[in-house]
Amino acid sequence: MNSIVIAPTFLKPSCAVGQIERHFFPNLPKEYYSHIICAEDDLKIEGDRFRTHIVPERKSVLKLDLLFRKLGWRDLVYSPDITYYSWCRRAFKEASKLIENERINYIHTINNPVSAHLVGYRLKMKYGIPWIAQFYDPWYNNPVRKYCFDYFKKKDYEREKLLAEYADIILFPNYELLNAFNDLYGNIINGSMAVIPFITEIPCRNTLTTFPNKCMNDVLTISHIGTLSADRRADVFLLALANLKQRIPELKLMVNFVGNMYSEDLKIIKELNLQSIVNVVGKVSESECQSYYENSDLFMIIDMNFRPNLFYPSKLLKYFCYGKPIFGIADKDSVVAHELVKTKNRVFRFEDIDGISSFIEQAVTDYSSICVNDIDYGSKFKTDNVIKQYVNLIEKI
C-alpha cells in the first residue's frame, strides 16, 4: 500500500505531532506499506521506511502571520491557519504531481495545522483516492481558535464539514473528541470513525519492579514536563506549594519544570520564595527529557482551563508509560481528568489549593499510599498495539 502523507510539521524536531508521527510511520510493516511524507522542513531521518518530499514554505507569508497576531487580527490567523497560505497550496500541486506519476493507494492527512485536511479534501475531489483524516487536536470545537466575527467561525464549520462528508476514515486520539465530532456531523458522515491512541517510543515500565514505593534519595521529586503559558498556568500549584512549605519549612521536596514557563509564574516563584524547592529547567531536547522521566517520583500535568476541553496532551501518554503516579490540575469534564480518574491517579480543580497541598504532603510523608495507579495503562500506547489497529483499518479501504 502506497500513500501520500500530508503532514507539514512532520519533520519539526520540537513539534509534538511530528515526534509522534516520526515514530509511527517507520514502524508500519515495511513489506506492505510505503509512504511519501509531504513536509515543510528537511530533517534527516535515519532509515528507509518512508521518503520525504520537501515542500518549502513561503517565508514572506509567515511574516503576515506575525503581523496579524501583533495587530490582534485573530480571525485572519485562524482562517483556517497561516499554513494554508504559506504551504498548503504548494503542497497540493506537489502531491498532485506525485499521484499522477506514481501508484498511490490512499491519502493520509494530519492536523495540526488543520489546513492539511483541506489539501486532502482537494486531492480526494480531484483523484477519487481514499482519504484518511487524522485529528490530534479539535478543529471547529477548539477553544483556542477564538474568533471575533461569526463569519469566520461559520467558515471553520463549513470546512470541517467537508472532512466529515468526504473522508473515508476519520481518526481521533480519544473518544471524547470522536463523540463531539459525531454530535456535529453524524448525519452526514459517510466514512468510518475510529480511535487510534497516540504512539510512543518509550518502552512501558513497571514501577513495582523498577522503582521502590518510596521516594528516591528520600526527597520527593515532582516533574512537570511540557510548556506552560497564559492558557496553562502553574499559579495554583505554586500557591499550594507555598502553603505546604509554610506548614513544613524543612520540606523534602524538589519540583522540576521542564520546558518553557510562563513569565507570570516565574514571578510567583520569586515572590513566594520557592527557589529552594523549585527547579526551572527550561526547554531541553527530547533526549535530555529522558532523565527527568526516569528520576521523578511523581508527575504533574496542568491542563488548559477551557470548556469543552477535548485535548489529549502528548506528555500524558509518556507519563503513563513510566507507570509512576500522576496528579493533574484540570476541569472534571476534560479528557485529562477522565484519563486520570480511569487510571486511579488524582485530579484537582483549578481552585483547589488546599486539596493539592494536602496531596503533596501525603506524597512526601507516605509515598507508597499514592502508588495505587494502574501501572499497565501505558501498554495501550505501545508501538505494536497502535500499529495493529491502524493496519486493520487500512485493510478495509
Located regions from the model:
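N-terminal subdomain of nucleotide-sugar transferases
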Residues: 1-58, 169, 384
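Nucleotide-activated donor-binding/catalytic signature segment of Leloir-type glycosyltransferases, i.e.
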Residues: 248, 257-259, 264-290
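Carbohydrate-associated surface elements
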Residues: 176, 198-199
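Nucleotide-sugar donor phosphate/pyrophosphate-binding loop at the beta->alpha transition
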Residues: 130, 140-162, 202
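Nucleotide-sugar-dependent
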Residues: 232, 285-291, 299-317, 326-338
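Conserved donor-binding/catalytic core segment of Leloir-type glycosyltransferases
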Residues: 214-232, 238-241, 386
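A short, active-site helix/loop in glycosyltransferases that binds the activated sugar's phosphate group
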Residues: 40-43, 163-192, 390
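Membrane-proximal helix-turn-helix segments that form the acceptor-binding/catalytic region
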Residues: 115-118, 122-125, 151-170
